[in-house]
A protein has these predicted regions:
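C-terminal reverse transcriptase regions that engage the nucleic-acid substrate
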Residues: 56-163, 178
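Inter-domain linker/hinge segments that demarcate the starts of reverse transcriptase
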Residues: 15-33, 130-159, 214-224
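Mobile genetic element proteins and their domesticated derivatives, centered on retroelements
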Residues: 4-6, 27, 34, 63, ...
Length: 224
């Protein structure tokens, strides 16, 4: 039997201790040693044996990298990629390797996808060398993609009252939706981007009105 990593959450370190004991007992009954425990709570980790803890500072949850010390999430995979590319084939590789399920990095990745679409429209071959203008444009895009790994987003959003709002918009090149969570703590309200979706406009030209309707559609789907 193979058991991969599991992820869960509780409100307090006391509840975490109880869950740890229950999980250990349950898996031990099946002769499975549940180990490599990690948490953003130092108190919880101190209560458990050191042999059960992981030494890693960062972990992945559903493909999203998490820093347990700072309790932040970030996009991994762009800092070590080479953006010195000269062909469509080389440009597509770094763009496709950036994993961003929450689409929090859409402002940076959308420009890269639009660039790839432009190459297709111009019927560029896979290994055809970029023109000087395309090379300069890609250099700017690559710089923005490289910065993604340095961006840290708070994982925890506290509050006792919550409201979800979504905003949509469109241009001739793309349409998008952004979902914000408004939370209130002691009368102070904060807004955090929690999810977004951006799509490139089809190669067949559509009116701005239709693209705005498509933006409203994906915005509604984001909430449902």
């Amino acid at each position: 039997m193979y058991v991969d990593h599991m992820s869960t959450g509780v409100e307090t370190s006391t509840q975490a201790d109880e869950q740890y004991k229950e999980a250990k007992t349950l898996f031990q009954s099946a002769s499975i040693n549940l180990r490599e425990w990690a948490s953003n709570s130092p108190k919880f980790l101190e209560n458990g044996p050191e042999c059960d803890r992981t030494s890693a500072e960062t972990m992945k949850v559903l493909g999203t990298s998490c820093n347990l010390t700072t309790d932040t999430i970030f996009t991994n995979g762009s800092h070590h990629l080479s953006f010195e590319v000269t062909t469509k084939r080389e440009a597509l590789q770094p763009v496709s390797r950036i994993y961003d399920p929450l689409r929090l990095c859409s402002p940076a990745t959308l420009n890269a996808r639009l660039f790839i679409q432009e190459l297709w429209k111009r019927q560029k071959d896979w290994d055809e060398t970029f023109s000087q203008s395309h090379q300069q444009e890609w250099s700017k895009i690559g710089e923005n993609l490289t910065l993604l790994s340095s961006q840290r987003i708070p994982r925890y959003i506290g509050g006792d009252k919550y409201k979800l709002f979504y905003f949509t918009d469109a241009s001739a090149k793309a349409y998008s939706a952004a979902v914000y969570l408004f939370s209130s703590v002691n009368g102070k309200t904060t807004a955090n981007l929690v999810f977004s979706k951006a799509r490139i406009a089809p190669a067949k030209q559509l009116t701005i009105t239709r693209l705005k309707l498509l933006g409203a559609l994906i915005g509604t789907r984001c909430l449902n």
